[in-house]
Amino acid sequence: MKGTESHGHSTGRAAKLHDSAGNKIGATAVIAGGGFMTDLLKNGSADGVDRRGFLRCMAWAGAGMVWTVTGGIPTSKLLGQSGGNEGFQFVQISDSHIGFNKPANADVNATLQIAIDKINALPQAPDFLIHTGDLTHLAKPAEFDTLGQLLQGARTKQVHYVPGEHDNATDDGKEYLARYGKGAKGTGWYSFDHQGVHFAGLVNSAALDGMGKLGAEQLAWMKDDLRGRSASTPIVLFAHLPLWTVYPDWGWGTSDSEEALGYVKRFGSVTVLNGHIHQTMQKVEGNLRFHTAMSTAFPQPAPGSAPSAGPMKAPAGKLRGVLGITQVEFVARPQHLAIVDATLE
């Protein structure tokens, strides 16, 4: 199993989060130059995220800035600056939707290739890629074939996958599991270790019930998988749908994520990576850092800004600016993960 993402260049500035009346409502965020922030904390939003800590949504920003959190304090650095001589990097890509050919993007193969080119242009090849689901649009064998052919061109050959709901669209995930499920449990969940970091690929897209769902079997597996691990072990969870409630009206969350997150709260460093919503949103809650990635295929509206979620046609010439990849760097001393989002421009 396996996945991917990459980077770009931008300047940034620190900014306070305010509501529409100018009242301060959040922590200091780092905003990429050339983007704008969609603030879900505005007017004390009803989904509860305002009560759970630092949140920023950069639906159109395409950040080119690394952010890190140490002791709950976000700090930033320009993309390309090294975090140290020790550690490793990996790249997240998401929602490639191979097979999609509607006006929002008539050539998703080409935009995925641009993402791969960005990954290949990184100064240091990432150790591996993570793909957080919706590899394909209709789970057809030919779509999986095309994805595989494109990813063969990535300089980093190891890719970890988790499925999205589109990968289960026509056959309950049989084709996906036949290709990527070797050694996985259930509908495709698994874990692995890399240089002292424990990764768990979770499946919350196989049994949708209004929102994502992990289910009792997977939760029991997760609890057992984490049992006995030192609290100092850095943990990375990755799944397709967000493991925090972004916008329940559109099903952007996981109904039983609270139990899953309860299993990792004893660990000192937990990073949670997701896709599905096709835009970058980040939240820090204690020792948990949540991050959703841009798609390589098409954007979706910011939560609540349209009648419903779905493919959104970008203004002419702007598509690459709302698609992107995510580069993650693990720094061994002090232990933390730095995350860089970059558009395909």
Locate predicted features:
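N-terminal twin-arginine translocation
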Residues: 36-43, 47-53, 64-83
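Short acidic, glycine-rich surface-loop motifs adjacent to enzyme active sites
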Residues: 231-246
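N-terminal secretory signal peptides
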Residues: 1-50
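Sec-dependent signal peptide hydrophobic core
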Residues: 58-63
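N-terminal active-site segment of His-dependent metallophosphoesterases
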Residues: 75-145
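Surface-exposed cleft-lining segments at the edges of enzyme active sites
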Residues: 100-102, 135-136, 205-213, 244-249
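Extended active-site neighborhood of metal-dependent phosphoesterases/phosphodiesterases
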Residues: 82, 140-234, 256-271, 283-294, ...
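Active-site neighborhood of phospho(di)ester-bond hydrolases with catalytic His/Asp-centered motifs
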Residues: 93-94, 129-133, 160-165, 238-239, ...
